[in-house]
Amino acid sequence: MGGDLNLKKSWHPSLLRNQERVWAEEKRALEERKRIEQLRREREEERQIQELQRLQEASGKGRQLNRVDWMYQAPSSATGHYAEEMEGYLLGKRRIDGILLKNDESKKLEKGTDVVGANAAPPPVNNPRDTMAKVMADPLLEIKKREQAAYENMVKESVRRSQHIRDKDRDRDRERRRDRGDRDRSRDRDRSHRRSRHEDEDAHRSHRHRSHRHRSRSPLSPDRSDRKRGDDRDYRDERDRRDDRRDEHRGHDRRDDRRSERDRRADRGDEDRHSSRYKDRDDRYDHSTRRRSYADRSPSPRRGNHYYDRRRTEDRSDGYHRDSRNHDRPEFYRGNDRKVNKEPRDSNLRERSSNTRDEVAGNKEKVLEEERKKKLAEMMSNADELEQKRLQRIAEVTAMEEKEREADEKQRSERGRFVGQLHRQLQEDSLDDRIRRSRGGLERMED
């Protein structure tokens, strides 16, 4: 036979594993019973101690308060274990019931000696030095002293930290003011340098333009003058944008060199740069408006056309007469006349170019005025059409609402008429008619 197959079951009691588990459970139960018995004995001892204290209080002894005074009382010297007992009391290794029983026994023995030698022995004298030594050796006093020292250190540390924070804020404000002053000075310096450079460039360009006009013999055409003014304006805009980019790049470089705690002031620096840029733009705008006002104060073509046409015809006639006179002169005299007439010709060219510019400006103003009038007429016509459509839509909506209201009133009146007929019929019905109508129901109930 192969043996008992029940040994292969996990629940079989013959297995060593199950036997060990049963032994461990029995051992745990035995230890539990021992702990319960020990706790019961301790409670019984405490009850007996309380009973003894009650009997002592009944016999006339003062009531003992449950305080920590027993820690500072010296144990009886009869045992001969003063140091060990004191260490056990302080560390909690000795039981309180044994201490109380020993104290009771020692007090019983001392009671007889007190009665015998009451008259002979003088009362105990409290030495102030001993009292001070006991107070200084008090562990609770030491604990209080340490707590007070820790509290004072904490207060001093908080005061020192707040003072350090105030000093740091003061230093940060001082650095911020210094950086703002440096930034303002550098911005003013860059602005003045840029303004002086722009003024030099404008002066050089105006001088070059005047020299070019003196050198040229033929007047500029309107398209060419407009193109030249557009090129100058584009050049000025490109120069301003380049200066702004240079300022921004310089501001970014200065911000990168500062410490990390100054990063929150970058927005303020950006606002200052934007305000300076807007100020430069306003300066350019004022300069352009002054230039336009100066151009507007110049004589218009309508007022001076007759004068300039007369001057032009006189110049032509004078030139024709001079040319006819010069045909009979030798080459040397004709050259001298050309040199003499050079200045009037340049002045005529300047007058012609100014006349052409004024004519172009007048034509542009006329075209703009016509376009503005045309747009205004279109807007007025569109507004009239929209107003007509709105009025037509309002009329349609009001007509539709009126029809719906009439239909509702008609339906409501018909419904009221029907309900009124029903009420009138009910009022006119008699008892015989009601019984006649309900006779069929009564017959069915009888069946």
Curated annotation (Swiss-Prot):
The keyword Coiled coil applies. It is found in: Nucleus. Keywords: Coiled coil, mRNA processing, mRNA splicing, Nucleus, Spliceosome. It holds the Pfam family Cir_N. Its main location: nucleus. Residues 153-204, 223-288, 306-377, 400-417, 432-447 have a biased composition (Basic and acidic residues). SMART domains: Cir_N. It comes from the Eukaryota. GO terms for biological process: mRNA splicing, via spliceosome. GO terms for cellular component: U2-type spliceosomal complex. Residues 205-217 have a biased composition (Basic residues). Residues 153-384, 400-447 are annotated as: Disordered. Residues 15-59, 363-403 form a coiled coil. Associated with the spliceosome. Belongs to the CWC25 family. Involved in pre-mRNA splicing. This is Pre-mRNA-splicing factor cwc25.
